A protein has these predicted regions:
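Sec-dependent signal peptide recognition
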Residues: 1-7
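Conserved redox-active cysteine motifs that mediate thiol-disulfide chemistry
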Residues: 97-105
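Short, glycine-anchored, charge-dense loop/turn motifs used at functional sites
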Residues: 154-158
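Thiol-based oxidoreductase modules, predominantly thioredoxin-like and allied folds used
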Residues: 93-98, 110, 118-134
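Non-globular targeting/processing and membrane-anchoring segments
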Residues: 9-90, 111-119, 136-145, 159-222
Length: 222
């Protein structure tokens, strides 16, 4: 276990606004940003997404947190073995923003799992490009939120999703959001992430993959 470090960061919920901080490698047509979320559009979006290394190299917000979690990310052996059993190919599409603390505390662990699992491939896009899918896969309290992680099959059909936070954290944090006391309680949220070290995120994500393999669309907490 690495040392517990809690960064003093501004309180925020990861509900993206109009501005985006993660460019696509090529400019997406306007039709893509506003199209109905169908498989053809997902194929285009995924193809234009960034690899994990390209995204990570360009992170310019909360970078210290991204770096810490990438450096220390480990996948428990039991979860790695279960992911190996899922097979593939599966495409993992992450809709995210570098400034989102939930993304910085979860995506490095998902990326670590993908890197070590044959049959999985990862691409990342920003919230502007992924807006239709954010709207279609809202958080339990009704927000279009980042990160939104979609598991796609070979035909780019959605076979599972993971939205914003582990369910165990939502049980604490969503009431905080409802009360509007994020600034006062964000330290507890960051401490939860630091203590958990990605385990709950990975456990839930593996359940999503296992659901995809069995034909069940799993979206924890929804």
């Amino acid at each position: 276990m690495h040392s517990l470090i809690v960064f003093a960061l501004p309180a925020a919920i990861c509900t993206p606004g109009a501005n985006s901080h993660l460019p696509l490698p090529e400019a997406a047509p306007l039709a893509l940003a506003y199209a109905a979320p169908v498989a053809d559009s997902l194929a285009t979006l995924y193809t234009r997404g960034q690899t994990w290394d390209a995204f990570y190299d360009g992170v310019d917000r909360r970078r210290e947190l991204w770096v810490q979690n990438r450096v220390h990310a480990k996948v428990p052996e039991d979860l790695a073995a279960r992911a190996q059993m899922v097979g593939g190919p599966w495409r993992v599409l992450v809709i995210t923003e570098p400034g989102c603390s939930d993304s910085a505390n979860s995506i490095p662990f998902i990326a670590k799992l993908v890197e070590g699992t044959p049959g999985l491939e990862l691409r990342l896009v920003n919230a502007t490009a992924g807006r239709p899918w954010l709207e279609a896969h809202r958080s339990p309290d009704g927000r279009a939120a980042t990160p939104t992680v979609l598991v796609l099959d070979e035909e780019f059909r959605i076979r599972g999703c993971w939205i914003e936070q582990p369910v165990a954290l939502q049980a604490f944090w969503l009431p905080v959001v409802a009360r509007g006391t994020m600034s006062e309680e964000v330290g507890a949220k960051m401490a939860w992430y630091a203590t958990d070290e990605g385990r709950e995120t990975l456990r839930e994500f593996v359940e999503v993959l296992e659901g995809a393999r069995s034909g069940e669309v799993v979206c924890p907490g929804l």
